[in-house]
Amino acid sequence: MKKTPRSTARELALLALSQLPKKSGSLEKKQLQEVVLAAVRTLRIEAQDILETAAAELQRGSDRLLNSQIDTTDIESARVMLYEAIELGQTAINRIGTAVELPEMLQLTNQLEVRSYAMEVLTKVNGNRKEVDKLLQESIVDWQIERLPRIDLDILRIAVAEMMFIGIQKQVAISEAVELAKRYSGEDGYKFINGVLRRVFDKINVI
């Protein structure tokens, strides 16, 4: 799926948030800019790591295929090795599919529009964290936000800040948060994040 500048900015802001202190505090613009630059470097490293891992998996798959022809004396062993080789190949292809998106994303991070919006998101989240976290705590059922994985909490904070302080349409903010969760959160994290933000949506509409 083709990334928009704002989708890229949100991802950049998410990576940058992970490098900010857990407690909110006053941060100068220069400090935030340095955090954004560090997030860009993280993306570059991620792209390199994905490709290196995919290459290693393809090599292991190739070795399995070769061994299935040379080292096995029965059909069942050969079948197992062949299956493992196919599985490694499929995993590598999936990784490469992810890596293919990263060059475009890295190119987008150089755009002023992308970095400016990432900075705006960071500024709003950091400057209004108490209010954002209060609303999130009220919207999470039988759980404390301090116990959430940091990545999930930061995705939620971005969406709430966009809805409350940047003026992004609520459905758009929720949809974008779900996409971030599918990429960065645990297996079912996106479902949890979607549910919490739906409740946030209802509370904001009442305010």
UniProtKB/Swiss-Prot annotation:
SUPFAM superfamilies: NusB-like (SSF48013)
Domain of life of the organism encoding this protein: Bacteria
The UniProt record lists the keyword RNA-binding: yes
Cellular component terms per the entry's GO annotation: cytosol
Xref: InterPro entries: NusB-like_sf, NusB_fam, NusB_RsmB_TIM44
Keyword Cell membrane: no
UniProt keyword terms in alphabetical order: RNA-binding, Transcription, Transcription antitermination, Transcription regulation
Molecular function via GO: RNA binding
BP GO annotations: DNA-templated transcription termination; transcription antitermination
N-terminal signal peptide: none
Similarity-based family: Belongs to the NusB family.
Function: Involved in transcription antitermination. Required for transcription of ribosomal RNA (rRNA) genes. Binds specifically to the boxA antiterminator sequence of the ribosomal RNA (rrn) operons.
Protein name as catalogued: Transcription antitermination protein NusB
Organism, as annotated: Trichodesmium erythraeum (strain IMS101)
